[in-house]
Amino acid sequence: MKSSMKMFAALLLVVMCLLANEMGGPLVVEARTCESQSHKFKGTCLSDTNCANVCHSERFSGGKCRGFRRRCFCTTHC
């Protein structure tokens, strides 16, 4: 009886380890996004598209309007 309980516990442990590995799936890592206020954008930022276009001219990957004062912030992967 004791050996069958030990065998059952060992088998249960192996099954749990296998299931834990299967549930994890591949690990995906996203790059961080860094922001910097645009130096060329003038005025209140009302359009993300306009902000992104100005940021592209500053060699950033994109841009968005942010904050209470609606400033253009350029974004890039860092």
Curated annotation (Swiss-Prot):
Q: What is its main location?
A: secreted
List, alphabetically, the Pfam families matched. Gamma-thionin
Q: Which cysteines are joined by disulfide bonds?
A: C34-C78, C45-C65, C51-C72, C55-C74
Q: Which GO terms describe its cellular component?
A: extracellular region
At the top level of its lineage, which domain of life is listed? Eukaryota
UniProt keywords, alphabetically: Antimicrobial, Cell wall, Disulfide bond, Fungicide, Plant defense, Secreted, Signal
Q: In which tissues is it expressed?
A: Highest expression in flowers and to a lesser extent in leaves. Lower levels in hypocotyls. No expression in roots and cotyledons.
Swiss-Prot/TrEMBL GO biological process terms? defense response to fungus; killing of cells of another organism
Q: Which family does it belong to?
A: Belongs to the DEFL family.
Q: What does this protein do?
A: May play a protective role in flowers by protecting the reproductive organs from potential pathogen attack.
User: What is this protein identified as?
Assistant: Defensin SD2
